[in-house]
From Swiss-Prot:
Pfam families: GATase_6, SIS. It is an enzyme of class 2 (transferase). Residues 2-217 form the Glutamine amidotransferase type-2 domain. It is found in: Cytoplasm. It comes from Agrobacterium fabrum (strain C58 / ATCC 33970) (Agrobacterium tumefaciens (strain C58)). Gene3D superfamilies: Glucose-6-phosphate isomerase like protein, domain 1, Glutamine Phosphoribosylpyrophosphate, subunit 1, domain 1. Catalyzes the first step in hexosamine metabolism, converting fructose-6P into glucosamine-6P using glutamine as a nitrogen source. This is Glutamine--fructose-6-phosphate aminotransferase [isomerizing]. Disulfide bonds: none annotated. The gene is glmS. The active site is at C2, K603. One of its GO terms (biological process) is carbohydrate metabolic process. Homodimer. SUPFAM superfamilies: N-terminal nucleophile aminohydrolases (Ntn hydrolases), SIS domain.
Amino acid sequence: MCGIVGIVGTQPVAERLVDALKRLEYRGYDSAGVATIDNGAMDRRRAEGKLFNLEKLVSEKPLPGVVGIAHTRWATHGVPNEINAHPHFVDGVAVVHNGIIENFSELREELSAEGATFTTQTDTEVVAQLLAKYTREGLGHREAMLKMLNHVTGAYALVVMFQDDPGTLLSARSGPPLAVGYGRGEMFLGSDAIALSPFTNEITYLVDGDCAIVTRDGAEIIDFSGKPVKRERQISQATAFVVDKGNHRHFMEKEIYEQPEVISHALSHYVDFATRTVKDADKAIDFASLSGLAISACGTAYLSGLIGKYWFERYARLPVEIDVASEFRYREIPLVPTQAALFISQSGETADTLAALRYCQQEGLKIGAVVNTRESTMARESDAIFPILAGPEIGVASTKAFTCQLAVLASLAVAAGKARGTLKPGEEKQLVQQLIEMPRIMSKVLNVIQPQIEALSRDLSRFKDVLYLGRGTSFPLALEGALKLKEISYIHAEGYAAGELKHGPIALIDENMPVIVIAPHDRFFEKTVSNMQEVAARGGRIIFITDEKGAAASKLETMATITLPNVDELIAPMVFSLPIQLLAYHTAVFMGTDVDQPRNLAKSVTVE
């Protein structure tokens, strides 16, 4: 969600701060700002909308100063505008904040009763007001910071700058991630290592309850009671990647076409291409002895987990409990230590998923993290890490991270089946061979289907509502297709299990309702065709996504039929992801929406 950067440097920092914010754009935002100290005075520039608005403002009205903080805001309290954009100033205190101050209403009332004047609608301003109040009362900056931290509740990462101490930044973490970066004669703070990667690869990740006092000479880390704590300094694997679309119009398009390559790279971590066998899974989780598996995630990652459930149950005969992370820990699920839990997150920082992870830890379960960021909080708090190796994903709507999650879950399910002795003789090699061939098949599909998808998207963009149907692993894929379309085109879309059509959704079917049916020629095909006939009988416009066998077997009239190669059931979800991603992408392009950063969405959701 919000992104934070801070620099205590030796040269002007404003442009460097804005450049670092560009590396946090993928998290989602609706406004941005930067502040510096120069000659004992603080100044700031803030702008609503895209970062180029802030960049232009800083270019027209430069900000001198070698110490500064910057922020991209995703609105939680108060509308997205310049006034509510960070940094917030109160009496010589500047604050940037990621998260939610849960008791801000109570604090705002208390401070207002004492005479404080609030100029924004944000929860963040209470932090600046409290710090200003405590320093007026005579507390030093460190003492004021600690008193404030023990007075606010919620999830937050904070960086604070005091006008009368121009060589120091104070920071704290209680929930959302925050990292300290070590340079030569300068120091950095950032929401993640990617933001700091142009400056340094030497990182310390703060943990919940840490407060860091950062100067040019280094960082002192204390807990919220003021006691010194030691945190490991490590070399980050994040690289200063170039934020470049290449020859593509959008990052999402680029990331769709990167999938064959990144999936091949991910698979090489989990399967042996020469022997056609799975590599041993992380030994921290013994799949052979498990009585069950819990899976939890949010959004697209949750839908990859739903597909993974089918695989673990089918190939490893392993019972799987799955729920969205925001509900998981509140259900009081009867868990036992003979189970393990997998948590799936592109960023590894999703707040609800982390909360569910910690719930399972308390229940004594071994924890596995399926993440794209090895240095994330989720990875650091897990017993086993299963990296998806998708590379940086900038588009808010996940594409390559989703299919890499699927590739990893498929590999783990086969590995679990091997460990548990539930695979038939020769089945491991057969399944691994399908996984090995998958990137080639996906590349072929991408080279063939775009013209048809693009033409179809023009027609689809005229409709206000769309249904997606599927059975088996195609049901979660229908949910994912609907999610993608609504995320980036803003067309209302819903996904259903095809067998549920008669239990309600069929009431919506008429000539104004496109119905996208995902149906490879598998063991569910004939039943899905029966559902298609029910749609056709009511005038629904069918878009049929199937394979060569399915196209030959169905004689129904459709609005369009997208025909893919015949593939094994194991890899079908990855291959069939491609047309639903491209369909959503091109529909959004025709509608003129912001494909890479759709309204109201954030890439990394770090608050509950």
